Amino acid sequence: MKFNNMIDHTLLKAEATTKDVDKLIAEAKEYGFKSVCVNSSWVKYVKEKLKGSDVLVCAVVGFPLGAMSMQAKVFEAKLAIDHGADEIDMVINIGRFRDDQHDYVLNEIKKIKEVMGNKVLKVIIETALLDKKGIKDATNIVLQSGAEFIKTSTGFSYSGAQVEDIEVFKEILGDKVAIKASGGIKNLNDMKNLYKAGARRFGTSAAVAIVKEQGKQ
């Protein structure tokens, strides 16, 4: 199995330069990755550079903390879509979620989805900051929200994608909502294990190394 078309080739570090983004774009085209995932200020630039290719543009919203106002997130999402984003990866308000303000979290996801039209929304719940009950509750919120994907992590917290968390997602969601694993995916074995658990999209900055490893097998 080839994982190329399941990978969001990702560059989200604060210090990313134009040269870094150009390299990301070139690699995504060369290896046939599903998307290039960048911070929202890069969307217009990346969209222009990807013109004529099948690679999608994915933008993060409310990243990495998820703690800004709902209005700010909705505006960022709309602007990213207007600039050409095909997909949005948003971070939920984790503090509000942990305060049991589940209606707030659900409403925020729905409001972002509303401004996206038919574009794909992935919802990051940051599993590292939740216990097992929290992961289940957050998964159920995503199930009600109309989002196309649930996503494990930003890659900026204590840990990233874990097989056991993907299994919890799958048990609750079945095939109703797709699963994206991200954070700490460093090699082909990581990706295979997460795929077996139910993940069908992968966010990683190690994509080139992983597909080269895949090519040797």
Swiss-Prot record:
<comment type="function">
    <text>Catalyzes a reversible aldol reaction between acetaldehyde and D-glyceraldehyde 3-phosphate to generate 2-deoxy-D-ribose 5-phosphate.</text>
</comment>
<comment type="similarity">
    <text>Belongs to the DeoC/FbaB aldolase family. DeoC type 1 subfamily.</text>
</comment>
<dbReference type="Pfam" id="PF01791">
    <property type="entry name" value="DeoC"/>
</dbReference>
<dbReference type="InterPro" id="IPR013785">
    <property type="entry name" value="Aldolase_TIM"/>
</dbReference>
<keyword id="KW-0704">Schiff base</keyword>
<dbReference type="GO" id="GO:0016052">
    <property type="term" value="P:carbohydrate catabolic process"/>
</dbReference>
<dbReference type="InterPro" id="IPR011343">
    <property type="entry name" value="DeoC"/>
</dbReference>
<dbReference type="InterPro" id="IPR028581">
    <property type="entry name" value="DeoC_typeI"/>
</dbReference>
<keyword id="KW-0963">Cytoplasm</keyword>
<feature type="active site" description="Proton donor/acceptor">
    <location>
        <position position="89"/>
    </location>
</feature>
<feature type="active site" description="Proton donor/acceptor">
    <location>
        <position position="180"/>
    </location>
</feature>
<dbReference type="InterPro" id="IPR002915">
    <property type="entry name" value="DeoC/FbaB/LacD_aldolase"/>
</dbReference>
<keyword id="KW-0456">Lyase</keyword>
<feature type="active site" description="Schiff-base intermediate with acetaldehyde">
    <location>
        <position position="151"/>
    </location>
</feature>
<dbReference type="GO" id="GO:0006018">
    <property type="term" value="P:2-deoxyribose 1-phosphate catabolic process"/>
</dbReference>
<dbReference type="GO" id="GO:0009264">
    <property type="term" value="P:deoxyribonucleotide catabolic process"/>
</dbReference>
<dbReference type="GO" id="GO:0004139">
    <property type="term" value="F:deoxyribose-phosphate aldolase activity"/>
</dbReference>
<protein>
    <recommendedName>
        <fullName>Deoxyribose-phosphate aldolase</fullName>
        <ecNumber>4.1.2.4</ecNumber>
    </recommendedName>
</protein>
<dbReference type="GO" id="GO:0005737">
    <property type="term" value="C:cytoplasm"/>
</dbReference>
<comment type="pathway">
    <text>Carbohydrate degradation; 2-deoxy-D-ribose 1-phosphate degradation; D-glyceraldehyde 3-phosphate and acetaldehyde from 2-deoxy-alpha-D-ribose 1-phosphate: step 2/2.</text>
</comment>
